[in-house]
């Protein structure tokens, strides 16, 4: 059922993409931006549904290979550009050239859920910072925002399915699925996800890649 639903929804999404690709020069800039925004939101919801169904199935279809981590991050930021621009994010990249062993599609989905979470809870003058630590046995990617953060009592549950916590007015719009799906995909990819936060001072997710 999920796959059928996604297939049906992708038809109008493909039409919207075609219009944007072929008619962008004739559209007012504000209209093009809004259509980009809607398209990316629709695609994000479809991806979440498909990954949820995929995680519950027997087949995963991952393809592990050496990946340039910066390339994956750039791809995710490009996908989320309309949402980041809508909230006026400043993105900081403090990254050395680093390769990791993973599945590109799965890794990009995981990173996208973290970015989406930061966008959802953004405050004024939002910042999204990516940094990298390279140790002897692991490479750690940190993704930090300056949003409202998470209370200490809630922090152990941020990766639980359906958990929305208490992070301001966006709580009622949250599904509690993004970080849950990120953690489940991370498990499949052999990665570790951890979260850190000070209430009122931002939220960070650390993705640990074992060195292989």
Language-model segments: which ranges?
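Short conserved segments within the C-terminal catalytic ATPase subdomain
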Residues: 83-93
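Short helix-loop "hinge" at the ATP-lid/N-box region of the Bergerat-fold HATPase_c
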Residues: 118-119
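Short beta-strand/loop element within the Bergerat-fold HATPase_c
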Residues: 125-137
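Acidic ATP/Mg2+-coordinating residue in the GHKL
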Residues: 145
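Short conserved segment of the HATPase_c
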Residues: 150-163
């Amino acid at each position: 059922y999920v796959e059928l639903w996604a297939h049906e929804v992708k038809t109008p999404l493909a039409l919207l993409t075609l219009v944007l690709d072929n008619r962008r020069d004739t559209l007012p800039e504000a209209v093009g931006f809004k259509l980009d925004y809607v398209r990316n939101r629709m695609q994000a919801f479809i991806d979440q549904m498909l990954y949820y169904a995929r995680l519950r199935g027997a087949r995963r279809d991952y393809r592990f290979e050496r990946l340039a981590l910066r390339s994956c991050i750039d791809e995710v930021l490009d996908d989320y550009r309309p949402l980041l621009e809508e909230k006026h994010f400043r993105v900081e990249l403090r990254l050395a050239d680093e390769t990791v062993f993973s599945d590109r599609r799965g890794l990009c989905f995981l990173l996208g859920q973290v970015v989406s979470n930061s966008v959802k809870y953004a405050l004024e003058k939002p910042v999204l910072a990516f940094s990298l630590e390279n140790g002897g046995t692991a490479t750690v990617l940190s993704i930090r925002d300056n949003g409202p953060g998470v209370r200490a009592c809630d922090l152990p549950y941020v990766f639980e399915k359906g958990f929305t916590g208490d992070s301001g007015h966006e709580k009622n719009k949250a599904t509690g699925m993004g970080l849950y799906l990120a953690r489940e995909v991370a498990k499949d990819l052999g990665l570790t996800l951890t979260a850190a936060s000070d209430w009122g001072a931002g939220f960070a997710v650390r993705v640990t890649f074992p060195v292989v």
